[in-house]
């Protein structure tokens, strides 16, 4: 005779950690060349002046400067863009 009743198995007992996406540097902040500005899936935010885009759509600063975000419309659709204003 078994002294313990057989326990049921759980099918939902796992979870994956978050991927830490999002905006890393906000408007008005000073950045150095190479700093990551945004980690994203696809082009939610497009690269503007002095901003580069990596293979995984990560936006990064190409020069030292100050971050500015901008929204603009094209064919009745709203887009966001990030620029770096260079500092001397």
UniProtKB/Swiss-Prot annotation:
GO terms for cellular component: cytosolic large ribosomal subunit. The keyword tRNA processing does not apply. The gene is rpmA. Belongs to the bacterial ribosomal protein bL27 family. This is Large ribosomal subunit protein bL27. It comes from Lawsonia intracellularis. SUPFAM superfamilies: Ribosomal L27 protein-like. Keywords: Ribonucleoprotein, Ribosomal protein. The keyword DNA damage does not apply. GO terms for molecular function: structural constituent of ribosome. Residues 1-25 are annotated as: Disordered. GO terms for biological process: translation.
């Amino acid at each position: 005779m078994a002294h313990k009743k057989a326990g049921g198995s759980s099918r939902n007992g796992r979870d994956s950690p978050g991927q830490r996406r999002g905006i890393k540097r906000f408007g008005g902040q000073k950045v150095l060349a190479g700093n990551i500005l945004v980690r994203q899936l696809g082009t939610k935010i497009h690269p503007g002046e002095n901003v580069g885009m990596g293979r995984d759509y990560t936006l990064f600063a190409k020069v030292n400067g100050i971050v500015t975000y901008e929204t603009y419309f094209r064919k009745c659709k709203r887009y966001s863009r990030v620029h770096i204003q260079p500092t001397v």
